[in-house]
Amino acid sequence: MEINKNDNNNNINNNNINNNNNNNNNNNNNNNNNNNNNNNNNNNNNNNNNQNNNQKNNYRNYKPIKTGTLIQHQILQQTLSNFQTKNKVFQLGSDKLILIFKENETIYFHGTIQARSIIGSVEVYGYTITPQSTTYYPIYSPFCSPTLSITSNNSNNKLYTLKEIIENQLIKIPELVKNKLKENEKQIEIDEPTLAISSIIVLKILDDHCENPKMFTKKKIEIIDSFKLLKGFYPLYQPDFNTQLLTIPNEWLNLINTQFLYNDHCNNNGLSILTCGERNVGKSTFNRILINKLLKKYTHIIFIETDTGQTEFTPSGIMSIDIINSPLLGPPFTHCKNNPLKSYFFGDTSPKNNPEYFLNLSFQLIDCCNLIKQQYPNIPIILNTNGWLKSLGLHLTQEIIKYFKPTSIVQLINNNNNNNNNNNNNNNNNNNNNNNNNNLNDNLNNFINRFDSTVTFSQDCINQLFEDCDDDNDDNKNLKTTIITKLYSINSINNFSQSIYKPIFNLGSSEIRNLMFKSYFKLESKGSLSHQSPYQVSWKELKVKILTNNVPPSQTMYALNASLVGICIDEDPEKNYKYISYKVGNNLPTIINQSPLISQCIGLGLIRSIDMVNGYYYIITPIDPSLLEISNTILKGSIEIPQTLTISVSSKGKILVPYLQLDVLSSYGTGSDVMNRPSFFDD
């Protein structure tokens, strides 16, 4: 395939195709989804405002603080971190600090940092950092996520005296650290003669470039004197801004420790866990903690992603399988991957528009996992599902469970039944004199609960699923196997949260997806998409498929222009598409007019423009050119590139949005040469 890097963006002909017709087939779906998200966000904001008003008397100098379009509130007067800095923090070189922890000490913080343990161990996001590893672990605690913490791991730590650490030859610590402790030994003993040390760590500035840096900084924030050396690290003691702490429920830890980490009584096939639950119950948080805990016992973990709306390692719309060998110490956009082990482009945030294709891709990922298990039978597996557990969504989840055959299912549940019961009791008391009204209210509540109540699995339900599988395999006894799957139902993280607050940058689902796209396309290091040089790709060997709606072949190129696409490799193109493809003309790529067979996705790309005369796509993508050269299929779904990724600023400071301008001839009455469409970026 002919691929050239086009360094002159001005040579790209953006007028070959009328961009105003771009992707009309997907606008209705996106608008509906956005409206639903906005309604949900409005409801959540109303609930939060009511809670904040109820707590008004408890605030310290209660004053709303306007941040952009959000109204934040000051937090309760309490100290978050209990780590004592006096004679416990010492500078080591130009970019490191030594921290001495006592028992039960914690530092809550925002920002970025690298941490290494010297004595004892500390916990971060469920992961235990031990002295056995000389690695500095990068930790990301953005202002848009719950606040992370570094906590001394008291359950496993022996307590030391400072003299013992310095003089005991059996305690191996770096010489530079030992010398620094010797220098400050007298000062520490004078201040606290009976100091019992639980752990000693070294913090280091995170020099690596971080995508989405605005999420890790705040214009006005109090910096503790002891930590001023560490640029970008903000410990929280009594912050004057809104924050939400990440608290890991003991119920979660007990389940992981007793059933997964220290329990060897799983099936002979090894540990395989499927996590499920409705939206906003904390599945992603639980999966990260589960991975971090399992890495204490296993060196590698297989992770299967089937939630296309809130992905962990890739941008939205991609279903993937990957092998994890390092802890996840931050939100998804801090560990976004360009090259997972294997991925498939689904092209939508929900399976409702193409459920059959969704199941086919899910089964393909599970088949890939089974091939890995044949070679490494003891490697644990985690499969993440989406939050759609009603009607068709419930059926899809059941089909995945039957095909995956996990040893364990973890179900996260929101327990809101108490509130519903209280409301029902109040209604009954108010209507005791009117039996007809009581009956009407009861019937109405029962009808609503049938559709609005949380859908949950039971152990009997799971057993019945596999009994049905055995019945289907009665004709083939070789396929009939005994499947033991245990169901664990635990409370969602919302039931344990002691804070009524949200992160200072309280982002919605679409905004979180935008952060993943920014990380994937590396906009901070490479600049906005409008400034990146595209690849010039010949379409002679490329097949094209629009996954959503029916787009006439004559309109396919209009739909592709300025759109986000999945770039794929069809390993057997002649066999797969011999009878379901055709060409509109000799100078156009092959159009797939039926459901595509499964082809591996090597990454995403933005088709910036199309040269209809010479037959080229101009594609912006982080994919390696050697992989791009062997690609032969382009798939387009309903996911569009966020506008925030393409904007640029003119020399006069005006925000420019590509593809949102109307060029007109300058004549009497037109007013100006260019009329900009209104957008939310305009002041």
Swiss-Prot record:
Residues 1-61, 414-442 are annotated as: Disordered. It is found in: Nucleus, Nucleolus. Keywords: ATP-binding, Coiled coil, Kinase, Nucleotide-binding, Nucleus, rRNA processing, Transferase. Gene3D superfamilies: P-loop containing nucleotide triphosphate hydrolases (3.40.50.300). Residues 420-454 form a coiled coil. InterPro entries: Clp1/Grc3 (IPR045116), CLP1_P (IPR032319), P-loop_NTPase (IPR027417). Its EC number is 2.7.1.-. It is an enzyme of class 2 (transferase). GO terms for cellular component: nucleolus; nucleus. Pfam families: CLP1_P, Cupin_NOL9, NOL9_C. It comes from Dictyostelium discoideum (Social amoeba). Polynucleotide 5'-kinase involved in rRNA processing. One of its GO terms (molecular function) is polynucleotide 5'-hydroxyl-kinase activity. This is Polynucleotide 5'-hydroxyl-kinase nol9. Belongs to the Clp1 family. NOL9/GRC3 subfamily. One of its GO terms (biological process) is cleavage in ITS2 between 5.8S rRNA and LSU-rRNA of tricistronic rRNA transcript (SSU-rRNA, 5.8S rRNA, LSU-rRNA). ATP binds at G277, E278, R279, N280, V281, G282, K283, S284. Residues 1-58 have a biased composition (Low complexity).
